[in-house]
Amino acid sequence: MIESFSVKNFRSIKHEQTISFLANNKIQGSSDTYVLNKISDSVSLLKFCILYGYNASGKTNILRALDFLRSLVVDGTTGSDTGTGFEPFTLDETTTQEPGTFALIFYIEQIRYTYRFIVDKKHFISEELTYQPMGRKALLFRRTHDEGTHISTVEFGTKCGLSAKERATLSGNTVDTISTLFAYQKSNIHSVELELVVAYFNHVLKPVVTPNTSVEIWTGRVGQSEMIPLSNILLQRSGLHIEGVRVSEKNPAPVFQHRTSLGFHSLPFDEESQGTLRYLGLGTTMLDGGVIPIDELEASLHPDLVAFLLQMFLLNTTGSQIIATTHNQSLMELDFMRNDMIWLCEKDEDGASEYYSVQEFGLHKRISIGNAYRAGKLGAKPYLGDPTIQL
């Protein structure tokens, strides 16, 4: 579970920006039992955050920044001459020469971790992982880079669980362009604490789900034994008049069973609607759980289906979260939606993306967020010119 994610100098993001899942304890609703993950008596994390903004405002870039952090842990780089893949803010000559800063605060088994690093196009400048096993901050490792010798040094805390030999191995394998956590996975050494963290990045924090990848995820897994029963449940509850989907050893391509007044009609996969496939891709991904970034949540889907998917996720998962971008304003009006769940994005005069929460406006709970947004009182919407065109 994520508490917050911060990034500075990445793509359209110039100044440090933070997206937080930390629930405001002053906001209470009847849906809190299933929209919140309770960490302690004083800390609860939201299971869902949604991000609005006009086109080209930079909504997707906060997801890309989170995915960049994840990929440096999970995928690393292929060689010392390939660089890190870092993309700075390019509308300012100064920032193009500066590094980016990334920080993720997250929980594993109720224990709070903080992972942060500073990186440029060529190498990691610093990297640190801390945690709070007994409520007190403890160092797992801290990495620094000597600009003169171009050598990275890794300092380990007493809680890291590595022998002196293993520490030397990991430090030696941590070359300029890869993260310490990626180097750990390639070093044939073992630390209980580091294993938990790399498992989190490999299995809990998911890659960004896009309109295309959501379909690919489903088609790539449709042959798994549990996927057909789950897909059939989703289809039968969708109102799409589809009874189910089947595959066979002779014909592994999915075939959809449509229900009509004349009986059932089989429709092959390549003739099924994009909306149906995306619904299945998103639905099965959501029910898998984890921390799921989703770009263009509403793509190819009716607003009622989107709302149904979100309710299904909230009611049937624990310890999971979604952060999604959308233009679907009707989601603002859903019964379970809280002010601290809704984030807005717009660009400043320098063309840099800024992200802020609706709760910062202090709206009364009886005020319609959707109406306030449509009226332009919350920003993050396009101000359009005269539609009349004379050539």
Predicted regions mapped to residue ranges:
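Switch/communication elements of ASCE P-loop NTPase nucleotide-binding domains
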Residues: M1-V73, V255-L391
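Broad gene-expression machinery/nucleic-acid interaction feature
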Residues: I2, E16, P99-A103, T114, ...
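Electropositive, glycine-dotted interaction segments
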Residues: T114-V247
